[in-house]
């Protein structure tokens, strides 16, 4: 089955971080910027009514640690059918989706169906919509929130109607499913089949790794892409200097086996609302501009669906904590003023080139992948994508040292598409190159 994401690039938009106002109206004004930069799918973190319960016994450890002192965790739902006034109104969401569609952008909303807030709107009428402990209280999940009871057919119907509602009434193009592997498989199969009867082109992104539910794997294959935490973590380790290129290759082969060859349906990321909240230092500060660009080049040219967290296109270093907002402590909006500075101007132009490269080069999203031999296997992460006789070569030095090496490939006739810190020439059957720390080279026929 063809991948519905095709050559699309996902942009994760967290409203609290995306603009100082933190609203859908403010975000809508910047949609032309996303289109011009070359993004295709706008994934909105939850904008539904969040639980404002101040009982800290129902606050996650992460929320307490953040210091935001904000009970409204966007991933702790109070009402799945209402828009939180922090972000705007239902009319604002309709206008946002319509504006996105006018630009050719798709919009995904975030479904948080594993748990809910302790004051969820349905609890008074349907106390059996959540699991209970032996004492009759809430059964709490990993993050300390009441866990939904999928043994209850009425809950399933309530949530299936919720999925249909935002497709029918707002025209959204699909969903990202929070911790999707913790929700029963058969719930997703039925729910996604229902919304695809409304719109056959619905896009579904699973924040999980249920291989049997991946499109193309079985008759129950309903998710078009999965998160791949193992790859994300290994690439971060490589950029941090805690892993090398050999570890990256080993991880790719491990993932290929686990995903049964469907690694092309893995979201490729180096950051997200979770990572930005939890990691001690933003990648832009930890790796520098060259390191970030090296990692993005790898993820945009290897098999999979590129996934970019908001702000990377302007080299933002803001804290981006998901719990902080203009209404709480720790406001942290993207520094759009970077676009007045050389580093921001450069990154935006560079991101446009990278996104265009991904869109235009069919070997990236249709082709096979192999790893050519190099004389510096620990430092160089090199791979070839090939489709219908056309090749694309990516070489990235993931080490902190300059490297002189050979890559076993005949590169005569290949053109340079993107490069930084790399000098190269063809000598016989090998590409000889000198490449600086976190340098990269992309060539194509």
Report residues per predicted region.
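Short, solvent-exposed turn/loop segments enriched in Gly/Ser/Thr/Pro and often Arg
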Residues: 43-52, 110-119, 178-184, 207-211, ...
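Active-site-proximal helices and loops of the catalytic beta/alpha 8
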Residues: 168, 178-261, 266, 315-353, ...
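Hydrophobic faces of well-ordered beta-strands that scaffold small-molecule active sites
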Residues: 9-11, 42-44, 107-109, 175, ...
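C-terminal beta-strand-rich structural cap/linker in extracellular carbohydrate-active enzymes
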Residues: 427-445
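Loop/helix patches that line or flank the sugar-binding groove of alpha-linked glycan CAZymes
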Residues: 52, 56, 260-412, 436
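Solvent-exposed beta-strand/loop surfaces of large extracellular or lumenal domains
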Residues: 416-431
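Substrate-binding/active-site clefts of carbohydrate-active enzymes
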Residues: 2-22, 31-40, 46-170, 190-199, ...
């Amino acid at each position: 089955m063809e991948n519905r994401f095709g050559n699309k690039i996902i942009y994760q938009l967290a409203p609290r971080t995306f603009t100082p106002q933190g609203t859908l109206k403010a975000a809508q004004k910047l949609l032309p910027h996303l289109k011009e930069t070359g993004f295709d799918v706008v994934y909105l973190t939850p904008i539904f009514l969040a639980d404002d319960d101040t009982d800290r016994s129902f606050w996650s450890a992460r929320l307490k640690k953040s210091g935001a002192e904000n009970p409204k965790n966007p991933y702790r739902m109070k009402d799945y059918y209402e828009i939180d006034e922090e972000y705007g109104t239902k009319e604002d969401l309709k206008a946002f989706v319509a504006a996105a569609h006018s630009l050719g952008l798709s919009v995904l909303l975030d479904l948080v169906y594993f748990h809910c807030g302790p004051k969820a709107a349905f609890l008074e009428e349907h106390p059996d919509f959540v699991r209970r402990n032996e004492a009759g209280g809430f059964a709490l999940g990993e993050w300390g929130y009441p866990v939904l009871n999928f043994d209850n057919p009425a809950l399933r119907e309530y949530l299936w109607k919720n999925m249909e509602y935002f497709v029918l009434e707002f025209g959204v193009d699909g969903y990202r499913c929070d911790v999707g592997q913790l929700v029963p498989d058969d719930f997703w199969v039925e729910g996604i089949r229902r919304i695809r009867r409304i719109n056959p082109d619905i896009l579904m992104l699973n924040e999980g790794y249920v291989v049997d539910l991946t499109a193309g794997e079985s008759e129950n294959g309903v998710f078009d892409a999965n998160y791949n935490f193992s790859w994300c973590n290994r690439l971060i380790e490589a950029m941090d200097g805690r892993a090398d290129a050999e570890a990256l290759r080993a991880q790719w082969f491990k993932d290929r086996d686990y995903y049964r060859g469907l690694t092309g349906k893995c979201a490729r990321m180096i950051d997200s609302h979770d990572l930005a909240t939890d990691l001690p230092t933003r990648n832009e500060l930890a790796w520098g501009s060259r390191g970030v660009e090296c990692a993005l080049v790898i993820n945009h040219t290897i098999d999979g669906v590129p996934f970019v967290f908001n702000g990377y296109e302007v080299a933002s270093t803001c804290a981006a904590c998901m719990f902080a907002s203009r209404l709480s402590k720790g406001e942290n909006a993207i520094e759009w003023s970077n676009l007045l500075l050389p580093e921001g101007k450069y990154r935006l132009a560079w991101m446009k080139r990278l996104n265009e490269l991904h869109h235009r080069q069919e070997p990236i999203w249709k082709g096979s992948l192999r790893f050519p031999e190099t004389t510096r296997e620990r430092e160089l992460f090199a791979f070839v994508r090939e489709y219908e006789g056309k090749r694309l070569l990516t070489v990235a030095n993931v080490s902190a040292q300059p490297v002189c090496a050979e890559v076993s490939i005949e590169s005569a006739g290949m053109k340079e598409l993107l490069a930084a810190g790399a000098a190269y020439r063809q000598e016989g059957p090998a590409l000889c190159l000198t490449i600086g720390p976190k340098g990269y080279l992309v060539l194509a026929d």
